[in-house]
């Protein structure tokens, strides 16, 4: 539908509108509208990045017609970025999928057939047949799911429960493996608990911002607006930016540094050395709250075991470490002198020293921010550990304005992938499948027979690709992501497995993405406020929203899909007799009965829904499904530092930062006076560790898996741009965003282009050892690579950037390094 100019102006001029439970409206903007055509407003977190901005969603006649920044939201305070302004339009692309589609020929499934509309019953029939066949012939390791940091909390929870408890397979992993896994392992190694200790309120209280591999100006623009305000309104505030190329965040930088890829490890160790050599260690903090350990080195690059680099590694995949003394640590970092670090990194000495002084100054509060530059790194866990070292040496942590802060890229990479535990090795609340006690807790809360959850870690994202290609993973469900475009090494390691006749691939998506078109079965999915949902953002803020419109056609939420699919399996289909013998009352029941319609999940009746409140899933199943799942999930974390508030509390507020104890959220963890888990007199307690102490790790600089050589003479890096989000499957369907940045380009230094007789605007072939892509030369614009490096975003489905990238991963986190491989260029 089209809005009249009068309605458009009314919808966008007000700071907030409509009296909805939990939303307060400033008196000045409570303008009455005609009841017959009034826009109804309700709150929701933004659908895009991990900042977690609050928006007001305006609906009219069953459609979303407007959105605006929520002035009551503490994250964004009424602001939106350019993507947030166009949220309504992501819902209504002309090619929106509205019914299941199966590859068919002559009325039957055929992997080489054409996509044909079918019913949900038929879709689940063939899906169940393929999953049951794989389970019967090869067991739980033959099935898998690739989920998302964009799934709602209960969608992720239901998926993990279905696979780990129902199918007894840990082969479920989220696309957050590609972006946040190194941060997770880094947090766990250093602190014993995941996620940042600080919050966004640090921005207004700090003296210095240091960005490590993070272009916040484009990737986290609302937070960047707050940083900009802090910097420009306070002359004593400093901004330092480190990256492998110049980008828009450099425009605000007092100290902008471009370093050679992978050498951030050396810079981090140099800063630690500078702190020690200049007597800037916070002795009182360090002595009481820190342990030291030496990590194993030469750990490989997460490639296939047959790869020469893996064969050559002395300790492939090892996360082992041993205690060390301060004197030993001092000697270790002493090797990273200013002169050596300049030689390795290419950063001028005066800039490195200025950065080190910033951290060492006891009068300066410092925040370190990072995203994919650290995490998508073959030593990403080490990079995370090393930046924690700096904050632990100086005691600049867990206090207002001070701390290390890992930013997230997806709206619920924290709340769903990490906190719920949709990784192949995790359970809710930082528990892991390899820990017998953790499995026992999960089995008790889920009312499962002892031994149901397998102890072996499942296949991570890249391992899933390899298993599909090798024919050992045969039934595969991809949900809420576009991994065929977003994952690495497409032609060699992913596409072959998807099109292998031994495998059956299901993709749940609202649009015909590259992934959907490569699948065998496409399930049309409800988006954003077409369902009730919850996200958890980067500052541990859990935010809820209500369903506000119905999904088009036969589209169904991912939660409905998971729960409904569970009805197709009896416990006898998936559990051995030794498990059934422990729970004879379960015989003959479906996984739906046991996992999703038990006495815990069904305890909240439909009467708890507000009158006329949309909630398609709950009304179909006959109970308040989301509330039942959330309260069951929350039981994992309450009482040991992961406390979530009661379900109903979140509908009344703009989110709460966990742990939430006695109704009060926590802004700064691990410090006395801020964290309810730190007792009086303790000052700090890193209670994720048994002794309450954080760990400083001695870890060296090690080179990248692939670097330029005589033939492939350029570094290649990929990432995002402001206007588009990830693979562009939503933003490229917004005409304004598409026009703003219609196609991917190759950013290159003018002298590198000239040396290859390439001119701006010309087409160019980018060639790696894995494939090639044609793009357009760009020697100007927002991104300015140094000589020897090129940068290309991956949002453009017509230019499959990740054909080029290497599937090397951090051996500890299994996260892919999208930032470093070698390419050469050729004229077209």
Swiss-Prot record:
Record-given protein name: Periplasmic nitrate reductase
Transmembrane intervals: none
GO biological process, one term: Mo-molybdopterin cofactor biosynthetic process
Binding site for [4Fe-4S] cluster: 46, 49, 53, 81
Recorded name of the encoding gene: napA
Function in brief: Catalytic subunit of the periplasmic nitrate reductase complex NapAB. Receives electrons from NapB and catalyzes the reduction of nitrate to nitrite.
PTM entry text: Predicted to be exported by the Tat system. The position of the signal peptide cleavage has not been experimentally proven.
EC number: 1.9.6.1
Organism expressing this protein natively: Pectobacterium atrosepticum (strain SCRI 1043 / ATCC BAA-672) (Erwinia carotovora subsp. atroseptica)
Catalysed reactions, as listed in the record: 2 Fe(II)-[cytochrome] + nitrate + 2 H(+) = 2 Fe(III)-[cytochrome] + nitrite + H2O
Compartments, as annotated in UniProt: Periplasm
Family: Belongs to the prokaryotic molybdopterin-containing oxidoreductase family. NasA/NapA/NarB subfamily.
